[in-house]
UniProtKB/Swiss-Prot annotation:
The keyword Nucleotide-binding applies. InterPro entries: Formate_THF_ligase, Formate_THF_ligase_CS, P-loop_NTPase. The keyword Kinase does not apply. Keywords: ATP-binding, Ligase, Nucleotide-binding, One-carbon metabolism. One of its GO terms (biological process) is tetrahydrofolate interconversion. ATP binds at T64, P65, L66, G67, E68, G69, K70, T71. It comes from the Bacteria. This is Formate--tetrahydrofolate ligase. Coiled coil: none annotated. Its EC number is 6.3.4.3. The gene is fhs. Pathway: One-carbon metabolism; tetrahydrofolate interconversion. It catalyses: (6S)-5,6,7,8-tetrahydrofolate + formate + ATP = (6R)-10-formyltetrahydrofolate + ADP + phosphate. It comes from Aeromonas hydrophila subsp. hydrophila (strain ATCC 7966 / DSM 30187 / BCRC 13018 / CCUG 14551 / JCM 1027 / KCTC 2358 / NCIMB 9240 / NCTC 8049). Belongs to the formate--tetrahydrofolate ligase family.
Length: 576
């Protein structure tokens, strides 16, 4: 079989104007970026009828280093729906350069179910991440500049500038810097070293752009006005009296919004079969809320009958955050959940196999092993029950691999129905495109006709502590929460300041339902340690770090960039 990049280059493509014309998008509301991608004006959202399409939310079992094919299934299902005569658009997140050059690689799907051109999808796209990085770092630079000038001018600051002093506490600055790259050396650093003109010396850190609060804001904003208001609410630091200092008070919110004006517009692209895809925003699901944008979903729902969107990692991660954060803020409601499962992924979740990065895969992973698969299906059952908890029907998509036996596929299908899925179907979208996902598409159409009513895990009025406890006990199946002294103090402060009404976004490992990646399958009787709690006032949630979570990843010993190059004709090679 050809490589992903070879399939991408050989796939027939529509010029972006023709793709937009298919969707009845007026030419003046499309802003082309080259031949095969273009921004969609926010005016389009205003001109569309009330959204009448049905949203299908794609999640998965607990992911493994092998990959379960969630993006492949998301794109393949959308193609499959079009294949059976049900108009569909996919909405997915933009890839971060960090994983592209790290271990994971790109996020454009794969095989015959990918976004094309895949090079453009994975590398820069329309520059949204760079714009967001610039806007984020503008706030950081403005904060340090204000700190410097207030200290330099002292009591003369207000008289000389006409500005009120902010009295920034250099030891209580909340806003890091950001970069769209995996770079562990930037996790802890000291800035302002040198002479007096080089700024105030203090500790600082970087987060990856996908973990910036600005990325969450971009994904959750409903329009330009909402974006501007959310940015103004961002808490950048605290003053010497312990009071918050916002981007509005620093007078930088307007300029930050200007930098994000184009980034607020979704990017229209296409799959290998010319199915339309809206690509927008890119918050990670382990260290952010892990879903594509509200604006892209609303546009797509006004343009077509079925919208297939992807939530990051397993149902304990992106799916939970879709319902408890994105749905809660936007009102966007899935008609159906699709859970992606693989035979090899469930074997890996059995806890019986020793799978290590860089080591040969266990033999039983690549040959028929029904007992190991049977044990691993407990993880599938947990995720089905977890998804059903939110009140919508669940279909299991069995993403087929060449090493799967018919007996294993049949066992997995039986386990899905036994655990409460309303249907299951094998998907071969990777090798067959939309035709390989037609059975899955039919199961999804049937599921979308079933009645459903969304149920959230906790009410708005519950305390932040109660929300955390509910997430651990109901969302992860744990026994309770272990708060560090720091987290306990932070929760008390946030409660006293009136932030209890916000939802909670837990940052944790995606490799286990629990906080511990070593706990495979369906762990029980565990407590989740919460090390730190942070307010994201602009995004509209409280961010809790479960264990030693890194918001700036690092490159591994065998990074993907080693294989990426360009030939004499300007063709990129080695990108996956």
């Amino acid at each position: 079989m050809l490589s992903d990049i070879e399939i991408s280059r050989q796939s027939p493509r529509l010029p972006i104007h023709a793709l937009a014309e298919r969707l009845a998008i007026p030419s003046h509301q499309l802003h082309p970026y080259g031949h095969y991608k273009g921004k969609l004006s926010l005016e389009l959202l205003k001109s569309l009828p009330k959204p009448a399409g049905k949203l299908v939310l794609v999640s998965a079992i607990t992911p493994t280093p092998l990959g379960e094919g969630k993006t492949v299934t998301t794109l393949g299902l959308s193609m499959g729906l079009n294949h059976i005569g049900q108009p569909s658009i996919a909405t997915i997140r933009q890839p971060s350069l960090g994983p592209v050059f790290g271990v994971k690689g790109g996020a454009a799907g794969g095989g015959h179910a990918q976004v094309v051109p895949m090079e453009e999808m994975n590398l820069h796209l329309t520059g949204d991440f760079h714009a967001l990085t610039a806007a984020h770092n503008l706030a950081a630079a403005a904060l340090d500049a204000r700190l410097f000038h207030e200290r330099k001018l002292g009591d003369q600051f207000s008289a000389r500038t006409g500005l009120q002093r902010l009295d920034i506490d250099a030891d209580n600055i909340l806003w890091p810097r950001t970069l769209d790259m995996n770079d562990r050396a930037l996790r802890h650093l000291t800035i302002g070293q040198g002479n007096a003109a080089d700024g105030v010396e203090r500790s600082d850190r970087f987060v990856i752009t996908a973990a910036s609060e600005l990325m969450a804001i971009l994904a959750l904003a409903s329009d330009l006005k909402d974006l501007r208001q959310r940015i103004g609410r961002i808490q950048l630091a605290r003053d010497l009296r312990g009071k918050p200092i916002t981007a509005e008070q620093l007078e930088v919110a307007g300029a930050m919004t200007v930098l994000l004006k184009e980034a607020l517009q979704p990017t229209l692209m296409q799959t290998t079969e010319q199915t339309s895809v809206l690509v927008h925003a890119g918050p990670f699901a382990n260290i952010a809320h892990g879903n594509s944008s509200v604006i892209a979903d609303r546009m797509a729902l006004g343009l077509t009958d079925y919208v297939v969107t992807e939530a990051g990692f397993g149902s304990d991660m992106g799916l939970e955050k879709f319902f408890n954060i994105k749905h809660r803020q936007s009102g966007i409601t899935p008609a159906c959940v699709v859970l992606v499962a693989t035979v090899r992924g469930l074997k890996a979740n059995s806890g019986l196999l020793d799978i290590r990065p860089g080591q040969p895969l266990p033999e039983s992973l690549l040959r028929e092993d029904l007992p190991t698969l049977e044990q691993g299906c407990a993880n599938l059952g947990w995720h089905i029950a977890n998804a059903r908890r939110y009140g919508v029907p669940v279909v299991v998509a069995i993403n087929r691999f060449p090493t799967d036996s018919e007996a294993e596929l049949a066992l997995l299908a039986r386990a899905a129905l036994r655990a409460g899925a309303c249907g299951s179907a094998i998907s071969s979208a990777f090798t067959q495109g939309g035709a390989g996902a037609s059975e899955l598409a039919q199961a999804v159409v049937a599921a979308c006709e079933q009645p459903g009513k969304v149920k959230l895990l906790y009410p708005d009025q519950a305390s932040l502590g109660a929300k955390l406890a509910t997430l651990v006990e109901c969302g992860y199946g744990g026994r309770g929460v272990q708060l560090s002294d720091k987290a306990r103090q932070q929760l008390a402060q946030l409660s006293a300041e009136g932030w209890d009404h916000l939802p909670v976004c837990v940052a944790k490992t995606p490799l286990s339902i629990s906080h511990d990646p070593a706990l495979k399958g369906v762990p029980t009787d565990f407590e989740v340690p919460i090390e730190e709690v942070k307010l994201c006032a602009g995004a509209g949630f409280v961010y809790a770090l479960a264990g030693p979570i890194m918001t700036m990843p690092g490159l591994g010993s065998l990074p993907a960039y080693r294989h990426i190059d360009i030939d004499d004709n300007g063709e990129i090679v080695g990108l996956s």
